Amino acid sequence: MSLIVIKPSYLCDEPIRNFAALARALRLEEVVLQDAAVMANSSYRRVVPAPGSTRETFDALGILKVIHRRIKDKIFAKVQFPDYLQGSVKHRDYVSNARKHTNQKILICEDVKKFFPSVQAGNIEDVWCAFFAFSQPVAKLLTQLTTKDGSLPQGAITSSYLANLVLWRDEPLLHAKMG
């Protein structure tokens, strides 16, 4: 029996190889990106948690939030996510996720505690370099722009997309084995 492995894919003619190309792709000036990267850790506000919640979430502020939206619209919009990935994917939600699990013999509902803060900057840089095939300098800059204090900030516009991609090498085979 052969396994059918379906991976996420980046539908783009050419990977981003330098800061000028990144600036063009995001329709921003290079200096804006570089300045925002330097200030990124201090460009978030902590979101007050709902009563009873223990999750620490953050919202990007000012130009960093603009950059996050552009990354979502100009880069993540070109990622084709497999059907088994539902979270934060356009036109997919908890309803479509529930439909996929209707009539299954086993249904497991789990939440990985502190998943976002456990995803380190090195993991994110690997996504930018290996999955997207961006150059190392571009990957480092994007990592600075999309992490807070060295990890993935839960609540940021880009974080769920990156969380979906951080296991891009391993998750497809696991999904195929589980059938």
Spans of features found by a protein language model:
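Short, flexible, solvent-exposed loop/turn segments with mixed acidic/basic and small polar residues
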Residues: 46-49, 97-100, 179
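Active-site-proximal segment of RNA-dependent polymerases
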Residues: 63-109, 114, 157-164
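Short coil/turn segments at secondary-structure boundaries
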Residues: 35, 84-88, 140-142
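Conserved polymerase palm-domain catalytic core
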Residues: 100-179
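Short, conserved non-catalytic motifs in the polymerase core
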Residues: 45-68, 87-90, 144-164
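N-terminal low-complexity, intrinsically disordered segments
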Residues: 16, 22-25, 29-30, 70, ...
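Non-catalytic, polymerase-adjacent accessory regions of viral genome-replication enzymes
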Residues: 1-47
